[in-house]
Amino acid sequence: MNIRSNPDTTLPAVTTGPLPSSRKIYAVPDSAPDLRVPLREIILSEAASEPNLPVYDTSGPYTDPSVTIDVNAGLPRNRIAWVLERGGVEEYVGRDIKPEDNGNVGADKAAKAFTAHHKPLRGLDGHKITQLEFARAGIVTKEMIYVAERENLGRKVQLERAEAALADGESFGASVPAFITPEFVRDEIARGRAIIPCNINHAELEPMIIGRNFLTKINANIGNSAVTSSVEEEVDKMVWAIRWGADTVMDLSTGRNIHTTREWILRNSPVPIGTVPIYQALEKCNGDPVALTWELYKDTLIEQCEQGVDYFTIHAGVRLQYIHLTASRVTGIVSRGGSIMAKWCLAHHKESFLYTHFDEICDIMRKYDVSFSLGDGLRPGSIADANDRAQFAELETLGELTKIAWDKGCQVMIEGPGHVPMHKIKINMDKQLKECGEAPFYTLGPLTTDIAPGYDHITSGIGAAMIGWFGCAMLCYVTPKEHLGLPDRNDVKTGVITYKIAAHAADLAKGHPAAQLRDDALSRARFEFRWTDQFNLGLDPDTAKSFHDETLPKEAHKVAHFCSMCGPKFCSMKITQDVRDYAATLNDPATVGMTISGTIEDGMAQMSAKFKEMGGSVYLDAEKVKESNKALS
């Protein structure tokens, strides 16, 4: 791990360099030899006697030692050529940055601006712009080819075991193929069952796909607030989150310098960036929801589209007629965006402008291929409120809005709860699929109990694994600081690792091809006491190694056939290996290589023959038995 500083900037050093015993490799799709799709190869020890293991990689160029990282310049804008090659777009001057874009921050509090500006692109009328429009027209884009190669992890070996893997899981109606082709990706997008969030102005993006027939993805939330954090910290947290496996990142900043913070993040992010535009719109009217207007919100949408935001959370399902349904709740309306719109609706006694102007919102987002993440502003904030009428009324409206957005050519995913006990989780998935036409589901957890402040990454990880198994396409992480404070980089890592576990467990349960390869590789390393391979095959090699080294720090302990839990005499795996070694060294050559069960059967047969040889009596002379045993030894 290297910490690279950036000259002439107040921005922090960001974490670069590969993870332990890993290297960046690139797969080249057969149908697009000009593309280089990143993967991480875990390098196994010589004792492993098996190939290195390629795994999905979200870390971008930050883990490639051959790339020079300069946060001031941003990442390479590789995708701009793909967009221009397709045509149907124009470059234009774009709107000016206004003081209110950064919360009217004074010069003494203003963050350093990102100076490497590029003119924004937008789609032309009458041309295909979005991935959905291309997919419906039967056109396979480079983004589709790219994500297909990524999903396959560069491992055609999975074809050999895909049928067995699929048979071992319960997919609950998902249609995960043995091998992901670009055509399959195109078809899933055309059906609305998957999205590739990829604003045409986010040229630094490494495309990824969200859908229940693909690997389960996770999102990490970052962002400053009015009381804490800075641009420096948020850029650092973004790089840190993707290092550990965040597939997308949402910038939920609500304090000063919102525009500037977002610009630094976008220009340095290889993963899709999402936002909640109402947060910035609220800052522009000094935090007063009643003062919000459609014109102000529209201007904010265009501002963020031009910057390159890949998906917007828009709480258009919070309608005036639903607000009274939350009156009897234990925790009322807990969504920030939902509460803002509820207050606006009640103050003006009007339908939400997000709902009444939804067609126009679609037209704006389509020009930049910004995906919808239709927000659940009425999600339950406690298990007591789970699955109530307010929650499901909003979900039904989101289903209606999904069809409108699809008709306009926009990509859509649906946000979900929240706080839901385990026995009420599946109905959420089933109802979402039914109401929203199988659009991808994206949930916050859900948290399965409310009794564990400080441990809500665990309470939510349980629900996340379950709903991921049932078909949820992306899981929004929860950190230990949930309900308590703004997460720092340690909390971000804990949240990401927790949700990588949940997502992987869901893929295993669905029978996703090749999901188990990493588990099996680690299990073999564990049984063979290849400690270093165990660490490196895990999701967090650093923590695994540090835990082991707390009690067995010497290098010699990395090859020891025991750990500090059981010690050398009580290790079950060591005992099992001893049994196998015994089977391999029996005098009878026929027993060499015999399995444990075979050894047992052979031993039983020997004792049966001995019983008959000594007369077949139940009770025998002790001295004769002793003499017989000596003969066998």
Swiss-Prot record:
Keywords: 4Fe-4S, Iron, Iron-sulfur, Lyase, Metal-binding, S-adenosyl-L-methionine, Thiamine biosynthesis, Zinc
Positions of region (Disordered): 1-20
GO molecular function: 4 iron, 4 sulfur cluster binding; carbon-carbon lyase activity; zinc ion binding
Cofactor: [4Fe-4S] cluster
GO annotation terms (biological process): thiamine biosynthetic process; thiamine diphosphate biosynthetic process
Binding site for Zn(2+): 419, 483
Residues annotated as signal peptide: none
EC number: 4.1.99.17
Pathway membership: Cofactor biosynthesis; thiamine diphosphate biosynthesis
A single cellular component GO annotation: cytosol
Binding residues for [4Fe-4S] cluster: 563, 566, 571
Pfam families on file: ThiC-associated, ThiC_Rad_SAM
Residues that hold substrate according to the record: 221, 250, 279, 315, 335-337, 376-379, 415, 442
Cofactor note: Binds 1 [4Fe-4S] cluster per subunit. The cluster is coordinated with 3 cysteines and an exchangeable S-adenosyl-L-methionine.
Transmembrane residue ranges: none
Reaction equation(s) it catalyzes: 5-amino-1-(5-phospho-beta-D-ribosyl)imidazole + S-adenosyl-L-methionine = 4-amino-2-methyl-5-(phosphooxymethyl)pyrimidine + CO + 5'-deoxyadenosine + formate + L-methionine + 3 H(+)
Biased composition (Polar residues): 1-13
Main function: Catalyzes the synthesis of the hydroxymethylpyrimidine phosphate (HMP-P) moiety of thiamine from aminoimidazole ribotide (AIR) in a radical S-adenosyl-L-methionine (SAM)-dependent reaction.
Subunit organization: Homodimer.
Full protein name: Phosphomethylpyrimidine synthase
Species of the source: Bradyrhizobium sp. (strain ORS 278)
Record gene name: thiC
